[in-house]
A protein has these predicted regions:
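Basic helix-turn-helix/winged-helix DNA-binding cores
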Residues: 1-99
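Short, flexible helix-adjacent loops and helix caps
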Residues: 34, 63, 117, 143-150
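A structural signal for alpha-helical segments
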Residues: 40, 69-70, 119, 126, ...
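Alpha-helical initiation/capping and key positions within long helical/coiled-coil segments
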Residues: 44, 123-126, 130, 158, ...
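Amphipathic alpha-helical dimerization/coiled-coil segments
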Residues: 86-136
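Charged, low-complexity intrinsically disordered regulatory/assembly segments
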Residues: 142-226
Length: 226
């Protein structure tokens, strides 16, 4: 897990669910099974929250929810953090340092609905162009090495695997971009923020988190207005 993908995940979940406390954010990310597919260490969530607070991407609010109670640290995304998340998501989609590593794209897709449809498609098109060049590069390398007895056969086999993986992602990208152009997915700027095309089950922990976040928001309103 790179610092980039950790930053996107933590900042993104704050943007979705804030105001929320660190435990809530950790619990939500673990419900996404980020330990498995994103290789995110749960302990790094709190570390990243601190980093995001220091650079102004999130704001920490210490709230006392009941008389005599201990303060609870809750986090909200700042305007700077919102702009930063959009930039990071676009960068993760467009930039292809390693065509064989799809993790930055997988992370970014979770927060693509914050973009406009047009910006998302443009980013996909840039990635498609980069993958087209990557395929050409691998095929050129294959042609150069073919028949060269100084090259171990298993190296050529691995190169074939790399080509297959890159072609597979390129095919998915082309199909996905076409679906989005045709109206697939929902994007926040389209004015349908309450209709994302799915409905979590009644026992989904997210409902409890939503209710708790609303309590924090009401408390923040009273504090800010005091």
């Amino acid at each position: 897990m790179s610092a980039l993908t950790t930053r996107i995940l933590v900042l993104g979940v704050v943007r979705i669910f804030g105001p929320a406390n660190g435990y809530q954010l950790r619990r939500e990310l673990l419900s996404w099974e980020v330990e498995q597919w994103a290789h995110l260490n749960p302990g790094s969530i709190y570390s990243m929250l601190g980093s995001l607070e220091r650079d102004g991407s999130v704001e920490r609010h210490d709230l006392v929810m009941e008389e005599g109670g201990r303060p609870v640290a809750v986090y909200t995304a700042t305007p700077q953090g919102i702009a930063e998340l959009d930039r990071l998501v676009l960068d993760a989609i467009e930039t292809v340092p390693d065509p064989g590593d799809a993790l930055p794209l997988r992370v970014a897709i979770n927060f693509a609905p914050f973009l406009s449809r047009e910006r998302y498609v443009e980013a996909l098109d840039r990635r498609i162009a980069a993958f087209g060049l990557a395929v050409q590069g691998i095929m050129t390398k294959q042609a150069h090495l073919a028949g060269n007895r100084s090259v171990p056969p298993h190296v050529l086999a691995e190169l074939g695997l790399e080509l297959g993986l890159v072609r597979a992602q390129l095919g998915w990208l082309v199909e996905h971009a076409a679906e989005v152009r045709a109206g697939a997915l929902t994007f926040a700027v389209e004015g349908r923020v309450h209709d994302w095309g799915f409905e979590p089950p009644a026992d989904d922990p997210g409902w409890k988190m939503k209710a708790e976040s609303e309590q924090y928001a009401r408390r923040l309103g009273r504090v800010d207005g005091a």
